[in-house]
């Protein structure tokens, strides 16, 4: 296909990304050329897993040098439902394969580098054209058999059985497989022969979920390259199942599963090759293995030492192969690859899992750096981690290291992060100590320099991917197993720049989560090989200058002991020490050797590894291996507290530091930028003081920081690392403080979190660095935090932590959160303070600020600043201004430059004794107490000043502490921080979810929860700087989300300063954030300075969980997509918000909008008009009165705002408040919309609204606005106690200002001044009070009335920073402003004149209103003024009105009728204009709705109308106005009355007909007869003239008697009629009642009587 040199600009990532239908993989044909000298000393891991002698055949080395730059593109064709098969036509491949086998044999003999070299030769010698075909048909049995040659069938685990399975029994023993040369024939699960790939072992072959196959590792890559020309390839054995299958099901359970098993990852459906080891992997391990993806180390130049390339490749391949028997555990996926079982103990197969499922594998090939952008289809690409796997050939130990690296890589894959695997030959264990090999590696590591560009790209995606990977089921990030025999394996180191002197390959495992899946244990074996599998948290260490992590791990005889420590992910043949158990014995022996071995260069790279990967190593490191890279990894894994171990690499590090310091810084910076949050947890306990090697040799305080995932401290250190001062300078003090804090945290944090990791933040600067990454990691000991140098302590805490980290899903990612770059450590420190502020804000940040401002707080701040520098806590509260502390810290930082950092960290940790830790904790407690007091006393202005000063101080201190190189790092970090800050999508975007949970599990939670003192903010900062959102959500301080209410962003920020601070990594962004926070705080505290904090706290408590869920936070602003509701014209539209140019410009694509046109909005608009889309989970979650919006119909895209109401049922014409709608329909909620409509809405069509969202007025006709307002007011008022209106204060159980109004009115109270005022207030509101209300609403209504709506929620919102303008605006929108005034007056002092019930309600309302108003005296005073004004205006109105009308109206209103409102609404009635005002009818009584009526047409019905003293009720008869017919008025029976949505009062009338209007009616004796008819009409209520009576004839006759004179004037002054019968005007059918007398009957009767009398007389 195509080969290119790493030097070429083209990158593998580009190539990979470019592929679509066919995926092209760049397979490095050879390792980078390296100086043969470098290779000679290193022991190398045979690709088969065997350990080979450090020396490699010269030819191999030479070949390596030649072929180091060539890459092979492998094209994979994808066909539906088929798995890729890679075929290549290369005679070269066969030769290579044979050569590889030969080399493997040689390696068996002790030349591990030979195989590596051979593979690299093959790769380089020929361009491999590999086509991967996906074929539906399964390979024939015969072909398979031929291809496998009785080798372990790799595809046996596939869902569909293949003939290969028959071969399985033959290869039951892992030993058999590795030993068999036929393994060359072995087919991949993918049907790709390792030989085809040109690699003897599959260690370098990576299969991406996309069906892409990649080879990695120098020699391995070469072997994989396609050396199998002579091998018969069988058709692809892939299964054809398109659907994803759980990995566990795929994994073979057979005891003798030497081959790799083909499995699909359930989540992504990607194909994963899992090594089938003699020991079955735990399901979680298998899952981890499946998830793990290691970037081919071949991409990284790997020829530092003779055989170094092969060692590196082998290490990379074997990194997943913990046991020396790499052959049993195929170097990579293909067990056959590992041919020498005899040489190595059977490694766990989990480690063989080098295939990383990645939807897309993007590789950037550069001479020194390979970046694999593992973009998983299912997981967001945003979380990309760079896995640097430096495999150093160093005998057996290298194998262990390789396994460690591989495990790290698998962990990385879990994070779906990019991994750079640097395969570098390492000298044998003795060589480890020697600097020269490391130097060779340095040359070979130009890659770190290349990394910087990659970092930016990766930075954004790493976190997310890492998080996604973290989700993988396996607690151990990597399935790799580390054999105990690997104990001697050199610790993996992160190489940030080619400068790394240590030859040991370092695998940067970004994705390693707390489980410490990497084989840091192997890392501690630096003596054997410096290859350190470090889980580097790209996010946390932005500054390359923190290489100190690469603490040198002296290679002691005990290096081999390192295997004891094992990662959760690592299965070791030898008993694995429990997580809590430290490997002091093994670690200790290693310490000296490891310490000597790691070069400063490694230390710097280790900074990159700042995440916990070193932790795994660190347990080993515990014996002072403190390899810089190991330590950082361990620090992340263990607790990222092993920074001190970094100093361990004294002589070697010191030497290397000079060489690699600059390069490492660059690499670190790049890695930091990449900052993938991967925080492996080390399960091995390390003894705290074991790796006593003083970090002094290394001046890399920054490295220490990196080792400590907690960023806050690392940035500080990074700034200073350049200067090399006494190793312990101020570090001892800081460490002591940090340790003390850790102890304190452990106690508190353990209670907060199940895991002891809560201590994490407190460790020394190392701890600080680790805290962010390892807060969850720190678990076992408070002292361990300082002791990354003390490997054992960390391991124990790490192991405890490991569980928490992995348990959160991949909380290790949290460690990654620590991603805040070391360069940005200073900046992040500031964010930490901010977080602190946020925390304090949730618990009193304002007072905290004041405290900080105060001298006391300054002193405390000084302590905390020292902590910040040396411990993750980096308390914001601490004032760094203290001159002594600053000078001490500066000295310490300068003393600890990259080379000294590790030693420094170790020394500090060692120095840190329990007493110091206790002292630190004491100081912290005192500081917190004082700070709280100060907070209470402090005022808003003071708080502002304090916050500004604090920010400035922090920045100044950070700058002072930071050395110029650090500052250089800091600039990118600042940029990153700005990105990561409120505007930083990387951190906010990636870690909001995982991070929060992880942090909660960590000590972060404890800090914020218990106090806002320095420890919590620093820990948050460190862990959150990159994944800021995570810490926010995870820790209590985070718990106060940076929910931004509409146009209340300031308030939200003020509420959750922690989040903001977390997001801001850089000092510049910190300043901006600080100023913003100040402004927000100002707004929030406008009402009152002294009581502001209390008020805010109360408001927060009142703030419903719904409001918090709905508010946008800074984290949401950086997510790729966020479901939101945006307010447009009073209606809400659901859509997806995406950042265009965060943090300023965003786009919202509304659902169902034509063409998916996006609306571009500014940050301000987003925060003001947008809320998160939250659907209620159940009807119970929508209590009556809840503000919500709902889809009226599926056909409409908009959601109408409204509120939940009680479902009402009409019973006998009366409205009764029925049980909540939930009782009748579980999934329906009765909703009253702001436009007056109501209905029962299905739960799925409802979305939550902020409780203080104002009632929008929908006035189709402005002329009806008055009536509309009244109508809504009436509706709300008459809804009864059960009803809830937004405008009144919250009453327990129901909030309805109108409810008390209607209740009060219902009583027969005498007219009172209050009633009069209410009446006139209502009438004059639009006129004179309108302006005054607008002016005063800000002060009064904004607080009190608006608050009434939420029952204090508004007040809380105001206290939280809702602007007065917003409150005023909201209040102005309320339809029931009149009621508001009335309500306020009632609350004032006139309640006594109201009914008892009313008093109760108003009293409750008053309490609700005055609770906030008492907190804000200004609001109270303003309200009083408004009331006074209202009274004055009412008096004026009184003069305008006639006394009679006024009194009648007042009396009516006192009785409870809302006539006044209806009089005001006369404009809504057409006839009203022709009637005197006092003759207008108004509703009387409570409105009701008929059950069963749905939709907008649902009306508010009333039983009664009233005018003055007259009342007419449904069922009554009335005379209607008519012209020209005084003798025959229109008379009808009132059937029903209601108010329309436009405010009109309508009456339905069943008309009566006069006899004159009928046809065929006989002459009736008595006038006043009426006939019922089916004729009904709807008329305006105002057409009713007056009430009349329509009686049965008997009653009528009894009333008037037989006197005919009475009947003559009946039409003149009598409104009594009788019902004579029924008439149908349409049919003209009349039915006369039987008892109705007619004139005809009378005549007949008279005649009969006369005749009778005459007869009698006769």
Swiss-Prot record:
Segments of skewed composition (Basic residues): 832-841, 850-865, 1325-1337, 1369-1386
Any one GO biological process: cell differentiation
Feature: compositional bias, Low complexity: 106-122, 948-973, 1020-1040, 1057-1070, 1346-1361
InterPro entries: BAH_dom, BAH_domain_protein, BAH_sf, BAHCC1-like_Tudor, TNRC18_BAHCC1-like_SH3, Tudor_WGE
Pfam family, one: BAHCC1-like_Tudor
One example GO MF annotation: chromatin binding
Chief subcellular location: nucleus
Keywords: Chromosome, Developmental protein, Differentiation, Nucleus, Phosphoprotein
Tissue: Ubiquitously expressed throughout the larval and pupal developmental stages in larval tissues and imaginal disks.
Compartments (UniProt record): Nucleus; Chromosome
Chain residue ranges for the region called Disordered: 85-122, 575-662, 829-878, 927-976, 1007-1042, 1057-1096, 1270-1308, 1323-1425
PROSITE patterns: BAH
GO cellular component: chromatin; histone locus body
Keyword Membrane set for record: no
UniProt domain BAH: residue ranges: 1510-1634
Signal peptide: none
Domain remarks: The BAH domain is required for localization to specific sites on polytene chromosomes.
Purpose of the protein: Functions in the determination of disk-specific identity, downstream of Hox genes. Overexpression induces ectopic wings with antero-posterior and dorso-ventral axes in the eye field. Overexpression is sufficient for ectopic expression of vg in eye disks.
Protein name as it appears in the record: Protein winged eye
């Amino acid at each position: 296909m195509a080969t290119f040199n790493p030097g070429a600009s083209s990158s593998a990532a580009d190539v990979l990304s470019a592929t679509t239908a066919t995926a092209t993989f760049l397979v490095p044909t050879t390792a980078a050329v390296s100086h043969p000298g470098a290779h000679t000393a290193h022991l190398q891991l045979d690709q088969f897993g065997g350990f080979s002698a450090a020396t490699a055949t010269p030819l191999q080395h030479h070949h390596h040098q030649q072929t180091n730059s060539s890459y092979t593109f492998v094209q994979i064709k994808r066909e539906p439902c088929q798995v890729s098969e890679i075929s290549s036509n290369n005679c070269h491949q066969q030769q290579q394969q044979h050569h590889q086998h030969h080399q493997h044999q040689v390696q068996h003999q002790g030349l591990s580098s030979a195989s590596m070299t051979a593979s690299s030769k093959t790769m380089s010698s020929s361009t491999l054209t590999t086509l991967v075909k996906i074929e539906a048909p399964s390979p024939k049995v015969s072909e398979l058999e031929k291809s496998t040659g009785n080798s372990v069938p790799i595809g046996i685990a596939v869902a569909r059985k293949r003939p290969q399975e028959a071969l399985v029994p033959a290869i039951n023993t892992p030993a058999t497989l590795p030993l068999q040369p036929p393994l060359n024939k072995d087919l991949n699960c993918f049907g790709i022969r390792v030989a085809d790939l040109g690699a003897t072992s599959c260690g370098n072959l990576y299969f991406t979920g996309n069906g892409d196959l990649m080879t990695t590792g120098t020699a391995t890559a070469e072997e994989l390259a396609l050396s199998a020309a002579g091998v018969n390839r069988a058709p692809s054995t892939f299964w054809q199942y398109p659907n994803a299958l759980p990995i566990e099901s795929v994994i073979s359970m057979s005891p003798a599963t030497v081959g790799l098993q083909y499995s699909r990852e359930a989540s992504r459906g990607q194909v994963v090759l899992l090594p089938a080891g003699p020991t079955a992997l735990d399901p979680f391990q298998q899952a981890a293995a499946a998830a793990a993806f290691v970037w081919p180390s071949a991409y990284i130049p790997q020829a530092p030492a003779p055989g170094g390339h092969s060692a590196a490749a082998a290490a990379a391949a074997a990194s997943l192969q913990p046991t020396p028997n790499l052959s049993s555990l195929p170097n990579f996926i293909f067990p056959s690859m590992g041919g020498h079982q005899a040489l190595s103990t059977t490694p766990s197969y989990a480690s063989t899992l080098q295939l990383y499922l990645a939807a897309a594998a993007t590789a950037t090939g550069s001479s020194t750096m390979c970046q694999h952008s593992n973009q998983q289809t299912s997981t967001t690409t945003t979380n990309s981690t760079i896995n640097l796997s430096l495999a150093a050939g160093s005998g057996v130990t290298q194998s262990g290291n390789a396994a460690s690296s591989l495990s790290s890589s698998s962990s990385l894959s879990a994070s779906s992060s990019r991994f750079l695997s640097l395969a570098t030959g390492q000298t044998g264990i003795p060589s480890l100590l020697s600097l020269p090999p490391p130097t060779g590696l340095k040359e070979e590591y130009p890659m770190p320099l290349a990394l910087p560009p990659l970092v930016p790209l990766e930075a954004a995606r790493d976190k997310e991917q890492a998080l996604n990977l973290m989700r993988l089921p396996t607690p151990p990030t990597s399935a790799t197993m580390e054999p105990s025999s690997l104990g001697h394996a050199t610790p993996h180191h992160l190489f940030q720049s080619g400068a790394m002197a240590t030859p040991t390959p370092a695998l940067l495992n970004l994705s390693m989560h707390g489980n410490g899946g990497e084989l840091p244990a192997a890392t501690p074996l630096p003596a054997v090989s410096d290859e350190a599998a470090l889980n580097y948290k790209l996010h946390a260490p932005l500054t390359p200058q923190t290489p100190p992590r690469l603490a040198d791990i002296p290679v002691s005889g005990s290096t081999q002991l390192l295997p004891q420590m094992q990662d959760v992910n690592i299965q070791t043949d030898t008993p694995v020490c429990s997580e809590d158990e430290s490997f002091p014995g093994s670690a200790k022996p290693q310490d000296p050797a490891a310490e000597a071995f790691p070069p400063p260069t490694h230390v710097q790279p280790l900074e990159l590894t700042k995440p916990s990967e070193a932790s795994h190593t660190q347990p080993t490191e515990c014996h002072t291996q403190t390899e810089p890279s190991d330590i950082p990894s361990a620090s992340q894994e263990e607790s990222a507290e092993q920074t001190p171990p970094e100093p361990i690499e004294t002589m070697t590090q010191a030497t290397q530091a000079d060489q690699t310091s600059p390069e490492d810084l660059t690499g670190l910076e790049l890695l930091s930028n990449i900052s993938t949050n991967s925080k492996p947890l080390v399960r091995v306990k390390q003894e705290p003081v074991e790796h006593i090697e003083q970090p002094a040799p290394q001046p890399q305080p920054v490295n220490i920081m990196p080792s400590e995932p907690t960023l806050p401290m690392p940035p500080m250190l990074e700034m200073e690392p350049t200067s090399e001062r006494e190793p312990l300078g101020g570090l001892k003090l800081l460490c002591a403080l940090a340790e003390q804090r850790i102890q304190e945290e452990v106690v508190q944090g353990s209670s907060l979190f199940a895991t002891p990791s809560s201590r994490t933040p407190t460790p020394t600067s190392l701890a600080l660095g680790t805290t962010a990454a390892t807060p969850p990691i720190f678990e076992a000991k408070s002292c361990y935090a300082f002791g990354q140098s003390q490997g054992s302590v960390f391991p124990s805490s790490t192991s405890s932590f490991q569980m928490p980290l992995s348990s959160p899903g991949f909380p290790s990612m949290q460690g990654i959160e620590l991603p805040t770059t070391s360069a940005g450590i200073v900046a992040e420190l500031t964010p930490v303070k901010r977080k602190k502020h946020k925390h304090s804000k949730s618990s009193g940040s304002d007072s905290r600020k004041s405290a900080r401002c105060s001298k006391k707080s300054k002193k405390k701040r000084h302590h905390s600043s020292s902590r910040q520098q040396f411990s993750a806590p980096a308390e914001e509260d601490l004032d760094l201004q203290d001159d002594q502390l600053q000078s001490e810290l500066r000295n310490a930082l300068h003393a600890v430059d990259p080379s000294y950092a590790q030693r420094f960290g170790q020394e500090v940790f060692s120095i840190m004794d329990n007493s110091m830790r206790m002292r630190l904790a004491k100081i912290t407690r005192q500081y917190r107490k004082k700070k709280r007091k100060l907070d209470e006393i402090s005022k808003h202005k003071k708080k502002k000043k304090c916050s500004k000063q604090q920010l400035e101080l922090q920045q100044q201190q950070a700058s002072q502490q930071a050395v110029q190189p650090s500052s250089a790092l800091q600039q990118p970090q600042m940029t990153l921080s700005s990105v990561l800050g409120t505007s930083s999508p990387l951190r906010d975007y990636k870690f909001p979810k995982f991070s929060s949970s992880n942090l909660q599990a960590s000590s972060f939670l404890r800090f914020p929860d218990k106090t806002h003192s320095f420890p919590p903010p620093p820990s948050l900062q460190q862990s959150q700087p990159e994944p800021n959102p995570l810490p926010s959500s995870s820790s209590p301080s985070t718990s106060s989300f940076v929910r931004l209410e509409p146009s209340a962003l300031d308030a939200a920020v003020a509420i959750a300063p922690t989040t903001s601070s977390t997001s801001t990594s850089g000092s510049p962004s910190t300043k901006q954030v600080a100023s913003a926070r100040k402004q927000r705080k100002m707004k929030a505290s406008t009402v009152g300075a002294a009581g502001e904090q209390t008020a805010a706290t109360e408001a927060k408590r009142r703030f419903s969980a719904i409001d918090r869920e709905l508010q946008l936070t800074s984290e949401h602003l950086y997510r790729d997509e966020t479901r939101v509701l945006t307010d447009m014209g009073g209606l809400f539209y659901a859509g997806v918000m995406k950042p265009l140019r965060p943090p300023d410009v965003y786009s919202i694509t509304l659902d169902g909008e034509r063409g998916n046109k996006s609306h571009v909005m500014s940050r301000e608009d987003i925060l003001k008009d947008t809320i998160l889309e939250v659907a209620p989970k159940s009807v119970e979650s929508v209590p009556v009165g809840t503000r919500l919006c709902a889809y009226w119909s599926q056909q409409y895209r908009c959601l109408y705002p409204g509120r939940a109401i009680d479902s009402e049922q009409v019973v006998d014409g009366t409205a009764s408040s029925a049980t909540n709608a939930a009782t009748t329909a579980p999934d329906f909620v009765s909703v009253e919309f702001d436009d007056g409509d109501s209905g029962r809405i299905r739960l799925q069509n409802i979305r939550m609204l902020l409780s203080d969202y104002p009632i929008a007025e929908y006035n189709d006709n402005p002329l009806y606005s008055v009536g509309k307002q009244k109508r809504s007011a009436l509706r709300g008022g008459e809804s009864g106690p059960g009803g809830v209106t937004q405008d009144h204060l919250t009453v327990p159980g129901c909030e309805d200002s109108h409810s008390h109004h209607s209740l009060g009115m219902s009583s027969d109270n005498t007219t009172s001044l209050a009633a009069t005022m209410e009446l006139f207030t209502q009438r004059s509101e639009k006129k004179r009070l309108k302006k005054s209300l607008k002016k005063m609403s800000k002060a009064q209504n904004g607080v009190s009335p608006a608050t009434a709506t939420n029952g204090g929620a508004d007040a809380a919102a105001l206290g939280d920073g809702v602007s007065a303008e917003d409150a005023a605006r909201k209040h102005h929108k309320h339809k029931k402003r009149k009621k508001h005034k009335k309500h306020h007056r009632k609350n004032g002092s006139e309640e006594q004149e109201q009914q008892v019930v009313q008093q109760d309600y108003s009293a409750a309302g008053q309490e609700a209103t005055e609770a906030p108003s008492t907190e804000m005296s200004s609001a109270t005073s303003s309200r009083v003024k408004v009331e006074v004004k209202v009274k004055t205006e009412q008096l004026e109105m009184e003069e305008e009105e006639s006394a009679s009308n006024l009194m009648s109206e007042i009396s009516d209103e006192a009785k409870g009728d809302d006539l006044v409102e209806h009089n005001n609404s006369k404009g809504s009635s057409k006839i009203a204009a022709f009637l005197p005002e006092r003759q207008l009818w108004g509703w009387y009584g409570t409105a009701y709705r008929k059950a069963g009526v749905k939709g907008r047409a649902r009306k508010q019905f009333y039983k009664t109308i009233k005018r003055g003293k007259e009342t007419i009720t449904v069922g009554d008869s009335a005379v209607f106005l008519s012209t020209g017919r005084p003798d025959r008025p229109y008379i009808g029976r009132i059937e029903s009355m209601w108010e329309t949505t436009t405010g009109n009062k309508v009456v339905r009338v069943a008309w009566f007909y006069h006899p004159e209007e009928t046809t065929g009616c006989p002459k009736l004796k008595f006038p006043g007869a009426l006939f019922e008819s089916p004729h009904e009409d709807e008329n305006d209520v105002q057409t009713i003239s007056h009430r009349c009576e329509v009686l049965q004839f008997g009653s009528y006759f009894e009333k008037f008697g037989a006197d005919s004179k009475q009947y003559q004037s009946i039409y003149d002054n009598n409104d009594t009629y009788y019902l004579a019968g029924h008439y149908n005007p349409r049919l003209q059918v009349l039915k006369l009642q039987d008892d109705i007398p007619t004139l005809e009957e009378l005549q007949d009767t008279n005649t009969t009587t006369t005749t009778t009398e005459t007869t009698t007389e006769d």
